[in-house]
């Protein structure tokens, strides 16, 4: 939904809002699959396109009350970031890649849709200037790798714990205004 809301702020028409929402939702996973030389995930599952379409239509209708749901939208965005990070890492692990590459794939999966969105909207990407976003993916990804490689916890426990770590990092960074240092 963040893509749809960003496009509506720029006063795009319905088609533009749909395109920006779509690119935001699938951009990171698309880049990941291209890097892994795998079929792009959304081309194999029309359900994904349907969910994006319906979510975008819902975003258009709730735009007027968006301010009432900022905390909820932030929470869902953070949960989605954690989920996409885990998906990217697991794709790397399935390809038997080095853990650092797996964390990189998780970060790409979680963040690059937003980077593409911001570039299409003619903005400096948010993760390069404002929020702790990619850092949350990297820390959460390292946590996931450690749990998977060196613990006897179940996969589900590792996944849920990692999502919680990412949500907590995002929440604390917003609450306490954490930012990455700027290079001057």
Functional labels for PLM-detected ranges:
Residues 15-21, 45-49, 70-81, 105, ...:
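Cytoplasmic-side transmembrane-helix entry/capping segments in multi-pass membrane proteins
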Residues 19-23, 30-36, 104, 108, ...:
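Short, structured motif recognition centered on aromatic/hydrophobic residues
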Residues 33-43, 89-101, 146-157:
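Helix-coil boundary and interhelical linker segments in multi-pass alpha-helical membrane proteins
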Residues 40-54, 98-110, 161:
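Structural signature of hydrophobic alpha-helical transmembrane segments
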Residues 1-10, 30-33, 57-70, 115-125, ...:
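C-terminal ends of transmembrane helices
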Residues 108, 157-171:
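Small-residue-rich transmembrane alpha-helices that serve as helix-helix interface/gating elements
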Residues 54-92:
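Ordered, amphipathic secondary-structure segments that act as subunit-interaction surfaces
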Residues 15-55:
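Alpha-helical membrane segments and adjacent membrane-interface helices in multi-pass membrane proteins
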């Amino acid at each position: 939904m963040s893509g749809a809301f960003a496009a509506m702020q720029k006063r795009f028409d319905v088609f533009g809002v749909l395109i920006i929402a779509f690119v935001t939702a699938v951009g990171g996973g698309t880049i990941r699959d291209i890097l892994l030389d795998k079929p792009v995930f959304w081309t194999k599952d029309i359900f994904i396109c349907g969910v994006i379409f319906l979510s975008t239509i819902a975003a258009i209708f709730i735009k007027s009350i968006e301010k009432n749901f900022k905390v909820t939208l932030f929470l869902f965005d953070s949960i989605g970031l954690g989920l996409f990070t885990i998906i990217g890492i697991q794709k790397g692990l399935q390809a038997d890649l080095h853990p650092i590459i797996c964390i990189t794939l998780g970060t790409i999966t979680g963040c690059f849709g937003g980077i593409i969105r911001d570039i299409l909207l003619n903005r400096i990407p948010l993760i390069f200037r404002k929020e702790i976003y990619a850092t949350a993916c990297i820390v959460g990804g390292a946590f996931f790798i450690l749990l998977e490689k060196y613990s006897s916890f179940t996969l589900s426990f590792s996944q849920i714990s990692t999502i919680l770590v990412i949500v907590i990092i995002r929440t604390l960074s917003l609450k306490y205004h954490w930012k990455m240092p700027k290079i001057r």
